[in-house]
Every structure is written in structure tokens, then in C-alpha cells.
């Protein structure tokens, strides 16, 4: 008779569960910091696997894109239909320093703008900021009734649509190409460009609901750490040295 192991005896008890490991035990929380143009700087937190061996947590975080409501960034519910994209460019301690990556409208807002008896006019243009960011801006506008108009519809003629679109692209080109990305973001928040278009096209056809509905980042320049730090108010210029005023009395020798 062959002597060997009894397979039935070596088996463990049926129904024993494997020891489950908490997946969050190997992860860390990092804070997300918004750049200067926004009022609220602490956006939220994000999870990442801890640095182990050749896998660095910082490398996993860099390049992450977060979509945040502009209402949360500005503490203003009037901006709730706009979403801002923020991109992680640098890690400092347990904080992710982000930069502006794009802007978009919520789909429900866009659908609510489209109505009967009016003309929808759209324009898009690719512009380059003074700090070499290549962006594509999409504008949207709708015709409205003139004062004391009896006619129900507000349809614009093809020649008027072309003239309005030309004016839209001119204004966007002028406003976007003459400033940095940060300055452009400051213009996009209060919708300065939309108001400029509305004012400039009054002579062609009165417009309403004029918005920059989308901003797409196509190309960015070489990463500049100093520029990013200045956006987050951590450029280190305050630590360089400050003039200290002290009470100092010049001693005068009475006798030589």
C-alpha cells in the first residue's frame, strides 16, 4: 500500500473567507489647489497610491485633470452652469498645484438657450496668448427682438449672420491674443468678451445670451515652475529678504 498524504485531511474548512485588505491603506490623500484668478483656492482632495519602489506618487498625480463647477470656485450660484478644468502641474508636499486647462457649459444650460423664432450664431477661433498657450475659443449668440417690434420671429439674414460672426472672431482674437492665460481666465469669469460682442453687434442685429461656451487648450509651452508658483502665491519672493526698520541713533563724538 502506498503511503502518502490523505488529501481529505489536508484540506481546510470549507467556507473560510480570505483575509480582506483595506484598499485605502496603501493610498494617500492630496489637496487640490486652484490658481490665482479663482476666489476659492482649496478645491478638494484626490487619492493616489503611495510611493513604492520605482512607482512615484508624484508622477501618478501630475497631469491629472479635475472638472470643477465655477460656482464652487467663485462662491456664486450664478456661475453654476459653467465647468472649469484644472490640470495638476506640480506637487508641493501634500498639495497638487493646478493650472487652467479649459472651460465648458453644462448640457442642460446649452439646451435651455436654444429656442424657437430666433437665430443661433456660433463662431470659433484658435488664438495664442502672450505666454504661448494655444487655445480654441467657441462663442455662441442668439438674436433677440428689437424695441417696439411687432413681428414674432427674430431671424437674421445670411449677410447679417456673416457680419456678426466676423465681428465675434475679431473681438475674441483681440481680447485673447493680447493677454496671458491668467488674464484671459480673469476675463472669462465675469464674461467680459460676451458683453463686448453684444455691444459691438447692436448695429447689425441685437443679440442676447452671448457667451464663450467652451475653451479648449490645444498646446501649452514648456513648463515654468516660477510662473506656476507665482499663480499660487508661493513664488518665494517674500522669503528672499525684507528691509527691517530699526531705531538707530548716530553717535556723535564730543571730544577727539
From Swiss-Prot:
GO biological process, one term: translation
Annotated SMART domains: Ribosomal_S3Ae
InterPro entries, alphabetized: Ribosomal_eS1 (IPR001593), Ribosomal_eS1_CS (IPR018281), Ribosomal_eS1_euk (IPR027500)
Modified residues (N-acetylalanine): 2
Protein's cellular compartments: Cytoplasm
Record region (Disordered): 1-22
A GO MF label: structural constituent of ribosome
One GO cellular component term: cytosol
Ranges annotated as biased composition (Basic residues): 1-18
Keyword annotations: Acetylation, Cytoplasm, Ribonucleoprotein, Ribosomal protein
Record-annotated disulphide pairs: none
HAMAP family: Ribosomal_eS1_euk
Oligomeric and partner information: Component of the small ribosomal subunit (SSU). Mature N.crassa ribosomes consist of a small (40S) and a large (60S) subunit. The 40S small subunit contains 1 molecule of ribosomal RNA (18S rRNA) and at least 32 different proteins. The large 60S subunit contains 3 rRNA molecules (26S, 5.8S and 5S rRNA) and at least 42 different proteins.
Family: Belongs to the eukaryotic ribosomal protein eS1 family.
Protein's job: Component of the ribosome, a large ribonucleoprotein complex responsible for the synthesis of proteins in the cell. The small ribosomal subunit (SSU) binds messenger RNAs (mRNAs) and translates the encoded message by selecting cognate aminoacyl-transfer RNA (tRNA) molecules. The large subunit (LSU) contains the ribosomal catalytic site termed the peptidyl transferase center (PTC), which catalyzes the formation of peptide bonds, thereby polymerizing the amino acids delivered by tRNAs into a polypeptide chain.
Name the UniProt record assigns to this protein: Small ribosomal subunit protein eS1
Amino acid at each position: 500500500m502506498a503511503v502518502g498524504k490523505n488529501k481529505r485531511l489536508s484540506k481546510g474548512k470549507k467556507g473560510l473567507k480570505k483575509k480582506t485588505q483595506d484598499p485605502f491603506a496603501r493610498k494617500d490623500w492630496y489637496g487640490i489647489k486652484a490658481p490665482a484668478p479663482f476666489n476659492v483656492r482649496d478645491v478638494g482632495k484626490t487619492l493616489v497610491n503611495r510611493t513604492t519602489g520605482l512607482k512615484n506618487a508624484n508622477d501618478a498625480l501630475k497631469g491629472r485633470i479635475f472638472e470643477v463647477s465655477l460656482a464652487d470656485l467663485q462662491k456664486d450660484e450664478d456661475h453654476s452652469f459653467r465647468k472649469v478644468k484644472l490640470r495638476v502641474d506640480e506637487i508641493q508636499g501634500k498639495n497638487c498645484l493646478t493650472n487652467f486647462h479649459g472651460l465648458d457649459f453644462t448640457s442642460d444650460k446649452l439646451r435651455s438657450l436654444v429656442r424657437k423664432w430666433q437665430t443661433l450664431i456660433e463662431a470659433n477661433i484658435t488664438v495664442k496668448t502672450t505666454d504661448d498657450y494655444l487655445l480654441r475659443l467657441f462663442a455662441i449668440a442668439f438674436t433677440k427682438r428689437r424695441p417696439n417690434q411687432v413681428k414674432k420671429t427674430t431671424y437674421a439674414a445670411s449677410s447679417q449672420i456673416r457680419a456678426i460672426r466676423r465681428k465675434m472672431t475679431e473681438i475674441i482674437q483681440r481680447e485673447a491674443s493680447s493677454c496671458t492665460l491668467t488674464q484671459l481666465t480673469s476675463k472669462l469669469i465675469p464674461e467680459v468678451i460676451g458683453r463686448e460682442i453684444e455691444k459691438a453687434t447692436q448695429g447689425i442685429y441685437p443679440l442676447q445670451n452671448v457667451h464663450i461656451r467652451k475653451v479648449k487648450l490645444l498646446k501649452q509651452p514648456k513648463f515654468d515652475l516660477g510662473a506656476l508658483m507665482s499663480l499660487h502665491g508661493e513664488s518665494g519672493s517674500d522669503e528672499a529678504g525684507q528691509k527691517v526698520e530699526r531705531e538707530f541713533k548716530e553717535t556723535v563724538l564730543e571730544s577727539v
